Structure formats: structure tokens, C-alpha cells
Amino acid sequence: MISIHAIDIDALLPQTQCTKCGYAGCMPYAEAIAAGDAAINRCPPGGETGIAALAALLGVAPLPLDVSCGTHQPHRIAVIDEAACIGCAKCLRPCPTDAIVGANKFMHSVIASLCTGCELCIAPCPVDCIRMEIDPQHPVMMNKDAARERFQLHTRRFERDQRERLELLAERERAVLSTDGNGHG
């Protein structure tokens, strides 16, 4: 196997961020492949074409898709049954590209052009109002670079929100500790 950087491997992955490979996203999977810790056949969205591209890059023989990770399917997108959606917002956080829009207690919708088809929104939905459909308008996977960029933005926003929450909690704790028992500073 030729020594290749993870970024070169990541460039060949479909950027669905689906985690079906067993890793937290496409880049962690690419890093595992580069380190020799993962096989090249664990990406169902990439299918045989993706496996062949990885094999060529790494100078190894292609392998059949590891079906324990799933099967290759045509690109599908999430569709929300808006009449059944209760607006719980549990599907928003798992979406790696922020393709689902909505607010708590309001119906949600999917921006089809941003959906990678990862299926990560399905399990958290308590009313099973999300289904996957082949999108005739977008039969081929969206632009990988755009999907990667949206995922990176999503991740940075989540990390920023987490950091701000922790700072707010620390500030509140300091305020409580700085007051005497009567609420005076």
C-alpha cells in the first residue's frame, strides 16, 4: 500500500458523513484508512466506484463492499411528512449539513439540494415522519466539496454553541458564588 495522506483519501469519499463505516464522518474514516486501521470497502454511499477509486489511489486491489456497513443505494434524500411532524427539532442536530430547517414546535422541511442522504435524521424522530426517497431532481450525489464545507460549518457552529453554553454556565456559577446568602454581592 502506498503512503497517502488522509486529505487525499477524504477527497474521494462521498462526504455523506453517514457514519455507516463505523467512524464519526468521512475524514475520520480517511484517517483510519491512511493509518492502515480501516479497510477501503466500508463506505456504502461510495459503492464499488468509490472502492475502486480508493484502491487505485492506495495501490491495492479493490475489495467487495463490506455489507456489514450497509448496501450501496442510489442517492436518496430525506423527506419530512410535514403534517405528521411535531416540531420536536430532534432531527436538526444530527443533520451533518444543516439541510433540515425548522424551529421547535414548528414543522420542519428538508432543503433537498443540501441533503447528503446520510439517514442520520431518521432514528431521532419520535413520530417516524422522515423517509428517504430518490430525488428525481438530484439523482446524483450533491457536490462533495460543498457537502464537506457544510459539514465543517455545522461542526464549527456546534462546537461554538457548546463553548458558549459552558461559558454561560461558568458565568452563572461565578455570579452565584459571588453573592452572599441574601442575593447581594
Predicted ranges, named:
Residues I2-S3, C69-Q73, S113-G185:
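Flanking helices and flexible, charged tails adjoining ferredoxin-like Fe-S electron-transfer domains
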Residues A53, R93, A123:
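Surface-exposed charge patches
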Residues H5-T16, D37-P45, L65-G87, L92-R93, ...:
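Ferredoxin-like iron-sulfur electron-transfer modules
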Residues M1-L63:
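Long, charged N-terminal interaction/targeting segments
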